[in-house]
Design a protein with these regions (language model features):
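Short conserved active-site loop signatures built around small residues
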Residues: 111
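C-terminal, well-folded lobe of enzymatic/effector domains
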Residues: 117, 122-162
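Beta-strand-dominated extracellular/periplasmic modules and repeats
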Residues: 1-107, 145-151, 155-158
């Protein structure tokens, strides 16, 4: 069992909120995620229904211009995974290769194995055919019941989306 992670609820780097279009599609640009003890590279995702962006609360004053999503309910919590060969390739490049913490393989990851991770592996398409380091486009279809109110699974407590 990996060590219990520290809470990162107050951190805003590599966090974001996107609103879907009329077809329920969302797009965002990010970097390939790193890893931490006991976990494979992944991106957390949470689907909120019925809320909206608001002005930052007083406790968020240190992050000017950061809107806070409020209201509604959580209809889905999950994780987006990447094909093992791509994760290995990326981890062999700088700055990922300087990481001293052992990377957990996809087939060793407790969340991937215990929570249907095989259905959450993104399809990756290289941006260019000549230079893989130019990046990838990741595609994942997630079917969500907007009326669902699933229980929180895992350790820690949920953070506020920002």
């Amino acid at each position: 069992m990996p060590p219990k992670p520290h809470t990162t609820d107050d951190l805003v780097f590599l966090r974001g909120v996107q609103v879907t279009d009329a077809q329920g599609i969302v797009e965002f640009k990010t970097i390939f995620p790193g890893h931490y003890p006991g976990r494979v590279n992944h991106i957390h995702m949470k689907v909120h229904v019925g809320g909206g962006a608001t002005q930052p609360a007083v406790e968020d004053a240190g992050h000017p211009g950061v809107a806070v999503y409020a209201g509604g309910h959580v209809a889905h919590t999950g994780q987006l995974f990447f094909p093992e060969d791509v994760s290995k390739f990326v981890e062999a490049t700088h700055p990922y290769s300087s990481q001293k913490v052992r990377r957990t393989a996809l087939d060793e990851d407790m969340v991937f194995n215990g929570q249907g991770g095989a259905e959450s592996v993104a399809k990756l398409t290289p941006v260019t055919s000549t230079q893989l380091s130019d990046g990838y486009v990741a595609t994942l279809v997630v079917a969500v019941d907007p009326d669902a109110t699933p229980k929180l699974v895992g350790f820690g407590r949920p953070g506020r989306p920002r």
